[in-house]
Amino acid sequence: MIRLAPLITADVDTTTLPGGKASDAAQDFLALLSEALAGETTTDKAAPQLLVATDKPTTKGEPLISDIVSDAQQANLLIPVDETPPVINDEQSTSTPLTTAQTMALAAVADKNTTKDEKADDLNEDVTASLSALFAMLPGFDNTPKVTDAPSTVLPTEKPTLFTKLTSEQLTTAQPDDAPGTPAQPLTPLVAEAQSKAEVISTPSPVTAAASPLITPHQTQPLPTVAAPVLSAPLGSHEWQQSLSQHISLFTRQGQQSAELRLHPQDLGEVQISLKVDDNQAQIQMVSPHQHVRAALEAALPVLRTQLAESGIQLGQSNISGESFSGQQQAASQQQQSQRTANHEPLAGEDDDTLPVPVSLQGRVTGNSGVDIFA
């Protein structure tokens, strides 16, 4: 770095020169100014020299030291300062602090840049608002995005649909009617299949054929027969009578109108029982083809009456026979019918005798084909 030689020396005798004090002050100012221009002096270094200079007396007409210092400060402020601050390392920032003038210049540059940025931001906001207002005033312009509930499915345009295939094939195979001698080409398999399906759907199906399963009578399967209870006690014994009475009481409580009891041994057959209960009055009819079984049933009626009374049912009419009531009615009806036919037969014979028959008809019946000459 270039260093300027100090301008003030202690050996110079300034007393012999005219205006020595003024020249000393001027020389001191020039020395300070040269050091400030070289960038090597600081305010702390220049302050003692200025203080030394102020101790010297001034003559009339000489400039004051304070005026000289103010002129030096103004000259320092007039030094051009670059807008871009120099790059300062950490070591330089700690060793050489900035001067007051440089700090003020840097602050002015920073304020200027901040003002420019704020103006640019305001300008951008104003331009954006103006553009949005202009676009909103344009007809048919809508900034709001349209929200759709379901994503629209776009069919691929590369693959033709079945309808386009059919239409193109029909157009290629179609020919004008005026072309002579060109036989009609058969339809494609896809078109033929589609037409056949359409014909099947359009043709009404007969109602009778569809309704035939409903009209046919439902074949009911026979219900499984419940095995009739068996009276295993000896016929006519007290145990047999008790068992018979208990079964009949159970039938009345269950509301059954007909029941069967098998006897032991099996040769005795079964006892068919018909019940009818009305206002706690029971009517019973028991049928058995064996005479000694019917006698045992008649002997068990008192025990049966007592058993029903314990259940709150009074035995009213009882009937024990060798055939059922329906069989008796059928036999009676057949007997009456035979009697009616017997009564009508003699009447038919009398009618045949009394009917007048012509002689010609009688001759035809007897086979006599002669001619009556006396007629």
UniProtKB/Swiss-Prot annotation:
Query: What's in the GO CC field?
Result: bacterial-type flagellum hook
Q: Which family does it belong to?
A: Belongs to the FliK family.
Keyword DNA damage present in the record's keywords: the answer is: no
Q: Where is the composition biased (Low complexity)?
A: 328-339
Keyword annotations from UniProtKB, A to Z: Bacterial flagellum biogenesis
Keyword Transmembrane found: no
Organism in which the protein naturally occurs: Escherichia coli (strain K12)
Query: This protein's superkingdom?
Result: Bacteria
Q: What is this protein called?
A: Flagellar hook-length control protein
Q: What does this protein do?
A: Controls the length of the flagellar hook.
Taxonomy of origin reads: Bacteria, Pseudomonadati, Pseudomonadota, Gammaproteobacteria, Enterobacterales
Q: Where is this region: Disordered?
A: 319-363
Q: Which GO terms describe its biological process?
A: bacterial-type flagellum assembly; bacterial-type flagellum-dependent cell motility
Annotated domain remarks: Two-domain protein with the central portion of the sequence acting as a hinge or connector between the two.
The record's listing under Pfam families reads: Flg_hook
